[in-house]
From Swiss-Prot:
Source organism: Danio rerio (Zebrafish)
Signal peptide region: none
Protein name in UniProt: Homeobox protein Hox-B9a
SS bonds (residue pairs): none
Amino acid composition bias (Basic and acidic residues), ranges on this chain: 152-169
Keyword rRNA-binding: no
Family: Belongs to the Abd-B homeobox family.
Length: 249
């Protein structure tokens, strides 16, 4: 009967509770009645509220992190301690030098003719060169092939022009002058018998050539106008010398 009476009182009080009152207050006010009853076989027992005991602080209140620094006269900022790395032994040091990749070094002055490899860039970008200068090695045979060939004279003309255009030794170097000593006179340009005969015929016909006639003779004999002009000048000087020597005899 006591259990039924407490249950009826609990439900009656919960129904009659006013709207303005806190429902939690009325609920907790009847805990003293409900705590006296024994739990039934289908009900869970009610446990008292848990109370935790406060744990003692890890550090005492008298300890302060800055008191030791201030007493010792050290700066307040804390710098972490970084241990120094131990020096490896000689065997491991040499082994690491073999394993590590050697860095790319700048080309030495003696290595200027080596072509630098381009560096790989991102997709869509042209490769960049490190050295920035590209040297092209060209042989003497390739240089002769690439050089332009002048259109045409015979073998005697090529010999004459080659002798005139030959580069002499360095004038500032006395040893070169002594080693390559030669006469200052240029090599004479030989003419063929056919060219000499035609020039003699033209000279007997006219000692002085006009510009148009000189151009035509040079074209027919495969000579330059300068060669024809010089030959006529020499031939006139030779004839004057012969005319001067004839009266004396």
């Amino acid at each position: 009967m006591s259990i039924s009476g407490t249950l009826s009182n609990y439900y009656v009080d919960s129904i009659i509770s006013h709207e303005g009152e806190d429902p939690n207050a009325s609920r907790f006010s009847n805990v003293q009645y409900s705590s006296a009853r024994q739990p039934g076989p289908g009900e869970h027992p009610e446990f008292p509220s848990c109370s935790f005991q406060p744990k003692p602080p890890v550090f005492s209140s008298s300890w302060s992190p800055f008191s030791s620094h201030a007493s010792n006269g050290l700066p307040a900022v804390y710098h972490p301690y970084i241990p120094t790395q131990p020096v490896p032994s000689t065997d491991t040091r040499y082994l690491r030098t073999w394993l590590d990749c050697a860095p790319r070094a700048e080309p030495l002055p003696g290595q200027g003719q080596v072509k630098m490899e381009p560096l790989l860039g991102h997709l869509g970008e042209p490769p960049k060169l490190v050295g920035q200068h590209e040297y092209i090695l060209e042989s003497s045979t390739a240089r002769e092939i690439n050089s332009g060939h002048s259109a045409g004279f015979e073998d005697n003309k090529d010999i004459c022009e080659g002798s005139e255009d030959k580069e002499g030794p360095d004038q500032n170097d006395p040893s070169a002058n002594w080693l390559h000593a030669r006469s200052s006179r240029k090599k004479r340009c030989p003419y063929t018998k056919y060219q000499t005969l035609e020039l003699e015929k033209e000279f007997l016909f006219n000692m002085y050539l006009t510009r148009d006639r000189r151009h035509e003779v040079a074209r027919l004999l495969n000579l330059t106008e300068r060669q024809v002009k010089i030959w006529f000048q020499n031939r006139r000087m030779k004839m004057k010398k012969m005319n001067k020597d004839q009266p004396k005899e």
